[in-house]
C-alpha cells in the first residue's frame, strides 16, 4: 500500500508554502519521517492573478529548482513528486481552456478550492459542468 500526500505546498517560491529552497528542503526532511511514497505538489492557482500557461511555467520551474536541490543535497528516500494545482474556484471554470493542465499529473483529479462565502446555485452548476462535461 502506498502512502500519498494529496496536497502540499512544497515547491519553493511559488505560493504561500515553501518560501525558498531551504524551507522546501526542510519540509521534505519532515515528510521523509512520515514515510510518504507519493506527494502531490499543489500550488495555488488563481485565475484572476495568473494565466494558466504562465502558472504552468512557474510551477515547472519551481519543480526543477526543487529536484535539482534534492539531488545536490543527495537526499535519499524522496517520495515521487506529482505536479498538480489547488485551483481557486472562479466563474467560468467549467469552460476554461487548458483547465485539464491543472489536474494532478497522470490523472483527471482537480483539487478545487471552493469560495469562502456561501455557495450559489451558479457555483454548484459550474462544478457539475466541470465534472460531467470535461
Where are these regions (language model features)?
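An N-terminally biased module of ancient metal coordination in phosphate/nucleic-acid-related enzymes
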Residues: 1-78, 129
